[in-house]
A protein has these predicted regions:
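Alpha-helical recognition/docking segments in bacterial nutrient-uptake
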Residues: 1-94, 158-159, 163
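Periplasmic-binding protein-like
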Residues: 42-48, 105-107, 140, 161-171, ...
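Helix N-cap/beta->alpha junction signal
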Residues: 49, 85, 116, 143, ...
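Hydrophobic alpha-helical segments within soluble ligand-binding/sensing domains
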Residues: 81-106, 121, 125, 147-155, ...
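Flexible loop/turn connectors
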Residues: 155-248
């Protein structure tokens, strides 16, 4: 993904190596992060996601280890780099409204993720501002970002309401499933997705959240946090990267 390319570019410029910590579940991720932090294997951490009450973030914060979140935090004391996802969700919805669409479906990721919550809030706000009804049956949330989830949700939503005239999806994998269902059933419903976008997807537009810049700024910021920690400085960095809608 572009965000990794951005991180890798700046890491290379400053002669840093990158380690990636993954796990099939929260326990495995906690073990991997604990080994990195307590074993002093890395100088700092970048979390590539953000969710409520994350025990990994809590642990790293308590250890006063240099880190930042690529996303949102409710705490004012956690450094982060993010987009304005409420505005991005609003702009995506408004894009379709201005095209004359009135029954806009929303397919998002897990409700635990701040990015899903915020893009959905933007969707709700746009419908409200334009005096359009919010039908809960026209929304769906996937616990996993999988193509088949997008396919299944699209089938379910259209079976419920055949008047849906636009679909917003917050992830490119979900969008691929949406497009596959529409193509297989010869349906022409404009679809919009967020980064990163696969060229083969037949989208009306996508929200460019500037993932390359998100990655670059994230690494530059964690370097600053690492230096601040060495100098006993405490500064909470918060940066918002702009987005834009691009028509296909």
């Amino acid at each position: 993904p572009s965000v990794f390319r951005g991180i890798a570019q700046v890491a290379s410029e400053f002669h840093y190596a990158i380690q990636i910590a993954t796990g099939k579940n929260e326990k495995e991720r906690m073990e991997a992060i604990s080994q990195m932090v307590l074993g002093k294997r890395v100088d700092g951490l970048i979390f590539l996601y953000s969710q409520e009450n994350d025990p990994l973030v809590k642990m790293v914060s308590e250890e006063q280890f240099p880190f930042l979140i690529l996303g949102k935090s409710l705490s004012p004391f956690i450094p982060l780099v993010d987009n304005d996802n409420i505005q991005a969700g609003y702009d995506a919805t408004e894009y379709f409204i201005k095209k004359g669409c009135r029954n806009i479906a929303f397919i998002g990721g897990s409700k635990r993720l701040f990015v899903t919550q915020d893009r959905y809030k933007g969707y709700q706000k746009a419908l409200e501002d334009y005096h359009l009804e919010l039908d809960p049956q026209n929304t769906a949330f996937a616990n996993e970002f999988l193509e088949e989830k997008g396919y299944q949700f699209t089938k379910h939503l259209l079976n419920h309401d055949s008047k849906i005239d636009a679909i917003i999806t917050t992830d490119s994998m979900l969008a691929e499933g949406v497009c596959n269902y529409l193509n297989q059933n010869q349906l022409s419903i404009p679809t919009l997705a967020f980064d990163s976008i696969k060229p083969k997807l037949d989208l009306a537009a996508y929200v460019d959240i500037n993932t390359l810049e998100l990655g670059r700024i994230s690494f530059k910021t964690i370097l600053q946090i690492i230096n601040d920690t060495k100098e006993n400085r405490q500064i909470c960095y918060r940066q918002v990267i702009p987005h834009r809608i691009i028509e296909q």
